[in-house]
Amino acid sequence: MENCRTPTNKTQITLNRTPTLKERRWNTLKVNTTNVRCSTPIFGNFRSPNLSPIESMGTKKSPVSPMRFAFKKPPAKAHPHPHQHQHHHHHHKHIHRTQLKPPPFILPKPQEEIIEPEREIKICSSPDTFSDDSNMETSLVVESRRRSIKASNHSYVVNHAANVEQILMHMGLENYVTNFEEAHIDLVKLASMERADLVKIGLNADEDCNRIMDVLQTL
């Protein structure tokens, strides 16, 4: 037990430690707090990794050049002869106008505007309408042709219609279908009807009676 005992000799051990207020060693730190950021004190050669100087952004240059340098004007060339300069300016102006002028764009005419002049040319150039340039005769010929075409259309519908209802629908008089059905009028009776017969079954409008009589006259 004599060999195993706690040593009693006093020994001074020097260890690195953080400066304390007792030793007043913190006064040796020279840090400009207005221009330096630090989160831990600086002592000797020890510096905090969070230490960074504060610099004004105005003194730094942007790595990207301003846009105004990208649009620099080309260096001025020697001025040519005045006559050559005028000729070149006139030629350049002429090229600029001819090249940048948009091509003319013409809208196509509607189909109705193309068909109507062709009809008028055919009517005026036909031998039936040849006259002494009288407007009245021309209008009469046009009206007679219109009526003949209308009559041919009516006769085609009447000849190919299956019943009276189809004829009335062709003339736009489908409202009177019930009147003809109640009177038991078929295609044979319709062809022999007169204006008084139409009034009897309820067709009181003169315009409607005239339209039906025009169709019956074409038969």
UniProtKB/Swiss-Prot annotation:
Q: What is an example of a Pfam family matching this protein?
A: SAM_2
Q: Which domain of life is it from?
A: Eukaryota
Q: Where in the cell is it found?
A: Nucleus; Chromosome
Q: How is it modified after translation?
A: Probably ubiquitinated: degraded during the oocyte-to-embryo transition by the anaphase promoting complex/cyclosome (APC/C) containing cort protein.
Feature: compositional bias, Basic residues: 74-99
Primary residence: nucleus
Give the gene symbol: mtrm
Q: Name one GO cellular component term.
A: chromosome
Biological process terms from the Gene Ontology for this record are:
distributive segregation; female meiosis chromosome segregation; homologous chromosome segregation; regulation of meiotic cell cycle
What PROSITE patterns has UniProt attached to this entry?
SAM_DOMAIN (PS50105)
Domain SAM positions: 159-219
Protein purpose: Polo kinase inhibitor required to maintain G2 arrest in the meiotic cell cycle in females. Holds heterochromatically paired homologs together from the end of pachytene until metaphase I. Haploinsufficient locus for homologous achiasmate segregation and may be required for the maintenance of heterochromatic pairings.
Per UniProt, subunit arrangement is: Interacts with polo. Interacts with cort.
Region of interest: Disordered:
74-104
Q: What name goes with this protein?
A: Protein matrimony
Q: Name one GO molecular function term.
A: DNA binding
* This protein's UniProt keywords: Cell cycle, Chromosome, DNA-binding, Meiosis, Nucleus, Ubl conjugation
